[in-house]
């Protein structure tokens, strides 16, 4: 029996994780839950999964939750500190890190320091502080297992192979809802249009990132840290059907790929049960029904966010943290109808240009850079 704490339990990844857990009561149990937006749903999760500790956004939400579940429920914490306490709490074997954005960094780092294995859905943890997190994973001898479908695919395709035999890794991208949209029309895109992803059901922020291709850019940086690959050995190909989740090309010319229906429960189930496998509940793949798989080069002129991410990776140091923070601010401004769709990468670019890179030595320095980038980007949205 493996005990789990889920950071981000009411979000898309959290709900999919609990669905996998629900299918395997003999394999998984829940120790802790943390959420940020839906106290009512968290109360339902508490009644079903009976965690011993939970966390919510703030003290007001904690009081609301206590009214919903009564005094006999679990210990309740709040804020980033509360999520971190859930992540490091005794009794859990693995922490599913699924808080959206850089807010997931501190709780994930605290969980690693507490010796917890990590199922990582929060790519920003590695984008912002990849060097630090990688060192902590080695120091505390924990497993860092990818939940993103692309990185799970690479992880599976690398199984049994030597790192020195890798020619390159290839991340696939759906291309988003505007894959064929002319550049001049992208300026007119509204949030409700960008939130309609052609293949995946995800939260608002990652759906916008997928539309700009920033999500793929963040995944490029995440892949660098997960698999110790330089930028020149990481490729991106647009694959609209989202059936091949990513590939590894080897020095002998052979390519290993992982295929499956576009359903996050598959990579989640693999991360939770690794090195074994368990039923995920997804629809089985029938290639005869799909018929055709197509591939294209990404258009970095129409979607400059992907180019900016590669630039940040090549520059290194604190540039990826600035890229991520500026993007979070710009996406929020777009969702609030304060800026246009094409303003998102423009604001990221301007924020990066204003940055003088540092070499952080601890988490506080990464967080200081994150704050600077948010303030700088926010000023550009006014």
Curated annotation (Swiss-Prot):
Keywords: Isoprene biosynthesis, Manganese, Metal-binding, NADP, Oxidoreductase. Pathway: Isoprenoid biosynthesis; isopentenyl diphosphate biosynthesis via DXP pathway; isopentenyl diphosphate from 1-deoxy-D-xylulose 5-phosphate: step 1/6. InterPro entries: DXP_reductoisomerase (IPR003821), DXP_reductoisomerase_C (IPR013644), DXP_reductoisomerase_N (IPR013512), DXPR_C (IPR026877), DXPR_C_sf (IPR036169), NAD(P)-bd_dom_sf (IPR036291). Its EC number is 1.1.1.267. GO terms for molecular function: 1-deoxy-D-xylulose-5-phosphate reductoisomerase activity; manganese ion binding; NADPH binding. SUPFAM superfamilies: 1-deoxy-D-xylulose-5-phosphate reductoisomerase, C-terminal domain, Glyceraldehyde-3-phosphate dehydrogenase-like, C-terminal domain, NAD(P)-binding Rossmann-fold domains. Its cofactor is Mg(2+); Mn(2+). Disulfide bonds: none annotated. NADPH binds at residues 10-13, 36, 122, 124, 203. Mn(2+) binds at residues 148, 150, 219. It catalyses: 2-C-methyl-D-erythritol 4-phosphate + NADP(+) = 1-deoxy-D-xylulose 5-phosphate + NADPH + H(+). Gene3D superfamilies: 1.10.1740.10, NAD(P)-binding Rossmann-like Domain. GO terms for biological process: isopentenyl diphosphate biosynthetic process, methylerythritol 4-phosphate pathway involved in terpenoid biosynthetic process. 1-deoxy-D-xylulose 5-phosphate binds at residues 123, 149-150, 174, 197, 210, 215-216, 219. Catalyzes the NADPH-dependent rearrangement and reduction of 1-deoxy-D-xylulose-5-phosphate (DXP) to 2-C-methyl-D-erythritol 4-phosphate (MEP). NCBIfam families: Dxr, PRK12464.1. Belongs to the DXR family. This is 1-deoxy-D-xylulose 5-phosphate reductoisomerase. It comes from Prosthecochloris aestuarii (strain DSM 271 / SK 413).
């Amino acid at each position: 029996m493996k005990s789990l704490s889920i950071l981000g339990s009411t979000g898309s990844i959290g709900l999919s994780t609990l669905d996998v857990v629900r299918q395997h009561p003999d394999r998984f149990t829940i120790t802790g839950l943390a959420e940020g937006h839906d106290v009512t749903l968290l109360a339902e999760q508490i009644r079903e999964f009976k965690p011993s500790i939970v966390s919510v956004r703030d003290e007001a939400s904690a009081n609301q939750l206590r009214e919903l579940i009564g005094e006999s429920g679990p210990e309740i914490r709040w804020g980033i500190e509360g999520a971190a306490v859930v992540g490091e709490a005794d009794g859990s074997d693995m922490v599913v890190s699924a808080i959206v954005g850089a807010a997931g960094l501190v709780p994930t780092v605290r969980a690693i320091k507490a010796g917890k294995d990590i199922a990582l859905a929060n790519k920003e943890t590695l984008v912002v502080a990849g060097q630090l997190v990688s060192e902590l994973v080695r120091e505390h001898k924990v497993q860092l297992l990818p939940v993103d479908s692309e990185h799970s695919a690479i992880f599976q395709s690398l199984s049994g192979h030597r790192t020195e035999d890798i020619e390159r890794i290839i991340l696939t991208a759906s291309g988003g809802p505007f894959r064929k949209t002319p550049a001049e029309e992208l300026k007119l895109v509204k949030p409700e249009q960008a939130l309609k992803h052609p293949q995946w059901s995800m939260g608002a922020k990652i759906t916008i990132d997928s539309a700009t291709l920033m999500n793929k850019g963040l995944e490029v940086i995440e892949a660098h840290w997960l698999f110790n690959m330089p930028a020149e050995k990481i490729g991106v190909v647009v694959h609209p059907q989202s059936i091949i989740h990513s590939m590894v090309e080897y020095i002998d010319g052979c390519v290993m790929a992982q295929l499956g229906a576009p359903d996050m429960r598959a990579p989640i189930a693999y991360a939770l049960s690794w090195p074994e496998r368990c039923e995920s509940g997804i629809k089985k793949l029938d290639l005869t029904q799909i018929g055709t798989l197509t591939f294209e080069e990404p258009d970095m002129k129409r979607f400059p966010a992907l180019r900016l991410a590669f630039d940040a990776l090549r520059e290194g140091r604190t540039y990826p943290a600035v890229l991520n923070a500026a993007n979070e601010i710009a996406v929020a401004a777009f969702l609030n109808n304060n800026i246009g769709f094409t303003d998102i990468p423009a604001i990221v670019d301007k924020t990066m240009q204003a940055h003088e890179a540092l070499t952080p030595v601890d988490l506080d320095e990464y967080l200081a850079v994150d704050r600077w980038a948010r303030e700088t980007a926010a000023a550009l949205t006014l």
